[in-house]
């Protein structure tokens, strides 16, 4: 157990360093505020990763950091476009870090991706939603080739919680 915990600590630190590098690169252009846009819904276990992370971050972050998308106020397919418009109005020069659950290959379940560039929410369930973000973070919650949205309801909560803890701890370390 201690060895596994030590390994996770290294993962958190590595992810935190990568995120910090990306944000510092963008801050060099004069952008100071950071907005974490955590996408998903509390009505589907597999799609709850974003709001879980948002709730964890909202309790921890301060200063020039804003969190949008929590369990209490989720950002999902229905309100995503309106939320993006509001972000552009209130935080026009912010660095947007978009966070969402993803589905992928079964052997990738539990992995986290961190990329420079926008997130394309809904791809795993064949929805065409607006791409958003300067940096994207996804946690692969399940493996699915079918694109069946009902699949997300059968994903184990423990898997989603582990990813939420990993991602939120990494962000808080950064």
PLM feature spans:
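Glycine-rich phosphate/diphosphate-binding loops that line cofactor/substrate pockets in enzymes
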Residues: 18-33
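C-terminal folded domains that constitute the principal catalytic or ligand-binding module
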Residues: 122-174
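Catalytic-core regions of hydrolytic enzymes
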Residues: 68-93
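Glycine-rich phosphate-binding loop
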Residues: 84-124
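A glycine-rich, hydrophobic loop/mini-helix early in the fold
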Residues: 31-71
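Solvent-exposed alpha-helices and their adjacent loops that cap or buttress functional pockets
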Residues: 27-29, 60-61, 88-91, 105-106, ...
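Short beta-strand segments
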Residues: 38, 97-102, 136-140
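Single conserved hydrophobic/aromatic residue that forms the stacking wall/gate
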Residues: 1-8, 12
């Amino acid at each position: 157990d201690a060895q596994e915990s030590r390994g996770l600590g290294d993962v958190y630190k590595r992810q935190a360093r990568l995120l910090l590098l990306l944000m510092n690169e963008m801050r060099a252009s004069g952008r100071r505020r950071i907005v974490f846009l955590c996408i998903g819904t509390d009505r589907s276990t597999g799609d709850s990763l974003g709001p879980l992370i948002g709730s964890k971050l909202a309790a921890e972050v301060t200063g020039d950091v804003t969190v949008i998308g929590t369990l209490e106020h989720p950002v999902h397919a229905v309100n995503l476009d309106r939320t993006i418009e509001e972000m552009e109005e209130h935080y026009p020069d912010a660095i947007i870090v978009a966070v969402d659950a993803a589905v992928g290959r079964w052997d990738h379940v539990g992995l986290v991706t961190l990329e420079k560039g926008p997130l394309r929410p809904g791809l795993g369930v064949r929805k065409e939603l607006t791409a958003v973000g300067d940096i994207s973070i996804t946690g692969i919650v399940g493996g699915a080739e079918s694109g069946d949205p009902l699949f997300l309801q059968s994903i184990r909560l423990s898997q989603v919680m582990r990813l939420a803890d990993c991602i939120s701890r990494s962000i808080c370390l950064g």
